[in-house]
């Protein structure tokens, strides 16, 4: 089930966090990524559509600061999850994505996308984060995080995954479509007799938000994919 799958995912993130991330920070150079709040996948209820980002931003004034010395107790994990739920309601990133599915896509079944970040490491400047995650001296951290997300999707196999930006799109293709050199905006991932349609966007939100034409085109692509899956 969705709940069981995200519990396993969150446990894997918790277990690798201290040893692997600490080692990654020690081995990489020229990076401003720091050991601070990371991000669990909070239970959002089941939905046929998921919305993938690269990594979560760091709140200006987070309620809980996680350091290398923090003890990840169940109480602290609960506080982190609660803060994330509040962010889903309050942050423009999530509001704009929900508005897009409501106003532009306009399909009742797709009004509540499930948000998931490929890398649950809080850092606001994505160009800095991309340099960090692609650093060849990173060690096993990226591979472990890639596997955690892939195992999660293999278990859930949602109907549609919309990838929010170009950076995340490139990395998702490496994880799920290794060896495929494709500039296609849609690819179908197959596993265990099920199919997930992945739709790659250049930039749905953030500073370089999609222009009106690109939003319309992405919304149309999502509708066409949904209707094709449901023989409409």
Q: Model-predicted segments: where are they?
A:
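A short acidic (Asp/Glu
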Residues: 61-64, 125-128, 165, 170-176, ...
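Proline-aspartate-enriched helix->loop->beta-strand connector
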Residues: 149-166
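Active-site and ligand/interface coordination hotspots across diverse enzymes
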Residues: 1-89, 148-152, 189-191, 228-232
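C-terminal capping/extension of enzyme domains
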Residues: 1-16, 135-147, 169-232
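Beta-strand-turn-beta hairpins that frame and shape the catalytic cleft
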Residues: 47-49, 105-113, 189-199
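Low-complexity, serine/threonine/proline-enriched polar segments
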Residues: 72-120
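Charged, often glycine-rich, active-site loop that binds/positions anionic groups
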Residues: 114-143
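Short, solvent-exposed loop/turn segments at secondary-structure junctions
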Residues: 55-59, 119-123, 166-170, 203-207
């Amino acid at each position: 089930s969705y709940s069981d799958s995200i519990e396993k995912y969150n446990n894997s993130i918790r277990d690798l966090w201290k040893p692997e991330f600490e080692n990654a920070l020690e081995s990489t150079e020229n990076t401003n990524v720091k050991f601070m709040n990371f991000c669990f996948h909070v239970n959002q209820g089941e939905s046929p559509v998921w919305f993938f980002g690269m990594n979560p931003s760091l709140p200006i004034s987070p309620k809980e600061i996680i350091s290398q010395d923090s003890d990840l107790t169940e109480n602290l994990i609960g506080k982190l999850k609660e803060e994330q739920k509040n962010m889903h309601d309050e942050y423009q990133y999530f509001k704009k994505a929900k508005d897009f599915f409501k106003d532009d896509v306009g399909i009742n079944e797709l009004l509540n996308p499930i948000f998931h970040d490929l890398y649950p490491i809080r850092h606001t400047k994505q160009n800095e984060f991309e340099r960090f995650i692609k650093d060849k001296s990173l060690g096993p951290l990226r591979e472990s995080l890639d596997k955690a997300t892939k195992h999660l999707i293999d278990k859930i196999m949602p109907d549609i995954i919309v990838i929010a930006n170009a950076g995340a799109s490139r990395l998702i293709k490496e994880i799920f479509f290794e060896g495929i050199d494709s500039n296609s905006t849609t690819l179908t991932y197959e596993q265990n007799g099920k199919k997930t349609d992945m739709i790659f966007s250049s930039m749905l939100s953030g500073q370089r938000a999609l222009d009106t034409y690109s939003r319309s085109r992405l919304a149309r692509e999502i509708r066409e994919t949904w209707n094709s899956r449901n023989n409409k």
